[in-house]
Curated annotation (Swiss-Prot):
Belongs to the DEAD box helicase family. DDX46/PRP5 subfamily. ATP binds at residues 300-307. This is Pre-mRNA-processing ATP-dependent RNA helicase PRP5. Pfam families: DEAD (PF00270), Helicase_C (PF00271), KH_12 (PF23469). It comes from Saccharomyces cerevisiae (strain ATCC 204508 / S288c) (Baker's yeast). A motif (Nuclear localization signal) lies at residues 90-96.
Length: 849
């Protein structure tokens, strides 16, 4: 029995133990469940609170909107009020204290700003109760926000701050709400416009009283020159490469440096240090003309000494003027160049003449160089600035135009002027000229003289003298022209390598001969330049030549400026080196040792060929220019056939000469049919022949159709697909010139110029082009003149019946300068011609098939 009882007790205890464990587990699970429930409850409370806060915020936003609406109503009441709101305390004594209600609210999206806005109406000021015990809940809430955010309210004005400023000014008496809003909007618009606007130079109008007089004429004719008869002068000019003169009062040419009246130091520098012998043709005629104070247009081949022609008169004029004061930056002389390489070269020439004279300082301002150093040098004062147009515009617009003053500029030079216009610098040059005094002396040098440049010279220069050297052929006679016709790119590259190897073998033979002679014989230095048409071709040819064991100095605009400068210095320093470059250096690069120029890619214009071949045979040296032509480069063959002299063609291989003539004839025939045409560029000897032929054809057509209307004649020319592009050019030539009248009006002491350009009787397509919005906006932007349509169109045979009727259709151009009016008319004619030619081209394409 005891055993049974003991077993039962053990079972009970084990059962109780199991129940206790289950109870403990249940309590543990319950505790976890309670904890989770409590956590969920707290999360629900947070969500509830956030929703309540969101509702509170929405209510607050609604109150803000109501306050805004109330403010707008109050503003309108103030504006409609006949009497202005008094902002000063009333002079009448009142026993009741005036209480001002001030409503403060926040428009900002963040919590870092505070805006307080207060308005007081007339009724509030005069009829305010003595005590206002009622408190607006919104006032209390906003006041608390104001106290909390007071420390963060000292920032920049945002949208809400504008209202705060308005109220403060309103209470102080006297600023209208609209004025504040308008001023703020205008300031914002002005800032945006300033960021987006292009850099434009302000035109400066000088009165005669504020301009300091200066001397232009320094030339005294020597007895030897003055004793020459007119016949002797003609013979001398004929012997000096057939000098052609246009203009009146041109001085006689000189033949010796001593006839110019130069100082002893300058004579020693020219003859002994620089080793200049006799004068070149352009120097013989240009130096006396410029030293006489005349504006000069010099047209001469490259490498003919044009730099000295304007540099000596410039230095002489600068030294004769009053020195710069401490507060004057200068300059007195300005030289504009198309490329930084040419500008640096001119600056080096200036330095040669001024390094011994501390009274004349020169600064070179070009793109790609550090502007900080240029600004520092300009602030110290400088007498001469050599610059590219773009960088000079940048300097003129710095610090609102206060960095540099153009008031003292009396001498302006444009070197390689045709290249300046070819690169599109005409607007910049026009802006620069508007800042310079009108009585300046202006000199323009170029290798070619296209119509666009001629038009600019007429506007800017005063009674200029035009000096043309060797006008019948612009290619330097010291350049021996050759060519090779290839039938593939690989063959052309093989010819290039062969030419370089032949050149190296020739130098080796010459050097071996010199080694057998006296040791005093200098080593031959004959450099070569290879011109290509693009940056990619330049890099490709450079790598291929390097693989062939030929090292070159490669230069193009895609390389960093420092790398270009290092390669150029290496090319100048090393003997018999080879420069590989694009056409960017076809002008202005002066390396006298260059004896060979290889044109790897055929040039597209005659002017480009002139300047490319002009890199060799500098001065009195001789050189060779070899063009590598592909069999399908017909335009290059045409240019070569027109540029090469007869004796050069006779000396060629008969088969090569025959193939060149066939390619040239094929291109010329294609031009007549409209199949081919030369790229746009400056005209040369070959282009003049085309022009004369077109003029002859035009005269014949005019004789045959002299009784037809001009509009019918133009339509027939345009709609004739047989003549192709040649017809287009002829039709553009038949566009009638614009008839206009120029007037001058003086009102209130100010002078206004205006012109009436009559377009009613012009052909319909001309009227369309003249009155297009794009045309008018372009002219306004370029000249600053106002141009508007006036009158109405009258069909042919109809006229205004009386004075009360509107006049015939015309364009009214108004401006403050007569030159701007003339420029506007020229641009209008140019745009009309371009538009008509374009329309004619589209007509040809549409009727081709």
């Amino acid at each position: 029995m005891e055993t049974i009882d003991s077993k039962q007790n053990i079972n009970r205890e084990s059962l109780l133990e199991e129940r206790r464990k289950k109870l403990a587990k249940w309590k543990q699970k319950k505790a976890q469940f309670d904890a989770q429930k409590e956590h969920q409850t707290s999360r629900n409370d947070i969500v509830t609170n956030s929703l309540e806060g969101k509702q509170t915020t929405e209510k607050f936003t609604e109150r803000q909107e109501r306050v805004k609406e109330e403010l707008r109503k109050r503003k309108n009441e103030f504006r409609k009020s006949d009497e202005p709101v008094s902002v000063k305390p009333s002079k009448k004594k009142s026993k009741r204290s005036k209480v001002k209600k001030k409503i403060s609210f926040d428009f900002s999206d963040d919590d870092d700003s505070e805006i307080g806005v207060s308005f007081r109406s007339k009724e509030h000021i005069q009829k305010a109760p003595e005590h206002d015990n009622e408190k607006d809940p919104l006032d209390e809430f906003m006041t608390s926000l104001k106290e909390e955010k007071m420390s963060n309210s000292k920032g920049m004005y945002d949208r809400g701050d504008i209202l705060d400023v308005e109220d403060q000014l309103f209470e102080l008496g006297g600023t209208d709400d609209e004025d504040v809003e308008d001023n703020t909007d205008n300031s914002n618009i002005a800032k945006i416009a300033k960021l987006k606007a292009k850099k434009r130079v302000k035109q400066i109008y000088y009165s005669p009283e504020e301009l300091e007089p200066f001397q232009k004429n320094f030339y005294i004719e020597s007895e030897t020159v003055s004793s020459m008869s007119e016949m002797e002068v003609e013979e001398l000019r004929l012997s000096l490469d057939n000098i052609k003169i246009k203009g009146t009062g041109c001085p006689k040419p000189v033949t010796k440096w001593s006839q110019l009246g130069l100082s002893t130091d300058t004579m020693v520098l020219i003859t002994e240090k620089l080793h200049f012998g006799s004068l070149t043709p352009i120097q013989s005629q240009a130096l006396p003309a410029i030293m006489s104070g005349r504006d000069v247009i010099g047209i001469s081949k490259t490498g003919s000494g044009k730099t000295i022609s304007y540099l000596l008169p410039l230095l002489r004029q600068v030294k004769a003027q009053r020195p710069l004061s401490k507060h004057e930056t200068g300059p007195m002389g300005l030289i504009l160049a198309p490329t930084r390489e040419l500008a640096l070269q001119i600056h080096e020439e200036v330095t040669k003449f001024t390094e011994a004279d501390t009274s004349i300082r020169s600064v070179c301002c070009t793109g790609g160089s550090e502007m900080k150093k240029q600004i520092t040098d300009l602030k110290r004062g400088t007498e001469i600035v050599v610059a590219t147009p773009g960088r000079f515009i940048d300097i003129l617009t710095l610090n609102d135009g206060k960095l540099l003053s153009t008031k003292r500029i009396t001498f302006v030079v444009m070197d390689e002027a045709d290249r300046l216009f070819d690169l599109g610098f005409e607007p910049q040059i026009t802006q620069i000229m508007k800042t310079v005094r009108p009585d300046k002396q202006c000199v323009l040098f170029s290798a070619t003289f296209p119509n666009k440049l001629r038009s600019f010279a007429v506007r800017v220069l005063h009674s200029p003298i035009s000096i043309t050297i060797n006008s019948k052929g612009m290619v330097n006679e010291n350049v021996k022209q050759k060519f090779r016709i290839c039938h593939s790119e690989d063959e052309k590259f093989d010819n290039l390598v062969q030419l370089i190897h032949e050149r190296s073998e020739f130098f080796d033979e010459v050097q071996s001969e010199n080694d057998g002679q006296s040791s005093d014989v200098e080593e031959v230095d004959a450099k070569a330049i290879i011109f290509v048409s693009s940056q990619n071709i330049c890099d490709f040819i450079s790598k291929k030549l390097l693989n062939a064991g030929i090292v070159t100095c490669a230069i193009h605009a895609g390389k960093p400026y420092q790398e270009r400068l290092m390669n150029l210095e290496k090319f100048k320093r090393e003997k018999n080196s080879i420069l590989l470059c694009t056409e960017v250096l076809s002008r202005g690069l002066n390396v006298p040792e260059v004896s060979l120029v290889i044109i790897y890619n055929a040039v597209k214009t005659f002017a480009q060929y002139v300047h490319t071949t002009g890199r060799t045979a500098r001065g009195s040296r001789s050189g060779t220019a070899i063009t590598l032509l592909l069999h399908d480069e017909l335009s290059g063959a045409y240019i070569l056939s027109k540029a090469m002299r007869d004796e050069e063609i006779k000396a060629l291989d008969p088969l090569q000469a025959k193939e060149l003539q066939e390619m040239s004839a094929k291109f010329e025939s294609g031009m007549k049919k409209g199949k081919f045409r030369l790229s746009k560029g400056f005209g040369g000897k070959g282009l003049e022949n085309i022009k004369s032929k077109r003029e002859e054809a035009q005269n014949k057509d005019l004789e045959l159709k002299k009784n037809d209307k001009r509009s019918d004649d133009l339509e027939k020319k345009i709609s004739n697909p047989r003549e192709g592009h040649d017809s287009v050019s002829e039709s553009s030539a038949l566009i009638p010139r614009l008839n206009y009248e120029l007037f001058k009006e003086s009102t209130d002491g100010s002078i206004i110029f205006y012109a009436k350009v009559y377009i009613n009787d012009l052909p319909q397509i001309v009227r369309w082009e003249a009155t297009k919005n794009t045309t008018l906006l372009f002219i306004k932007h370029e000249t600053g003149c106002s141009i508007t349509n006036k009158g109405k169109f009258y069909p042919e045979g109809k006229e205004p019946k009386n004075e009360n009727d509107e006049p015939k259709l015309y364009l009214l151009i108004e401006g403050q300068d007569e030159k701007d009016i003339q420029l506007s008319i020229e641009l209008l004619e140019q745009k009309v011609k371009e538009g008509v030619v374009k329309a004619a081209s589209l007509s040809l394409k549409s009727t081709k098939y």
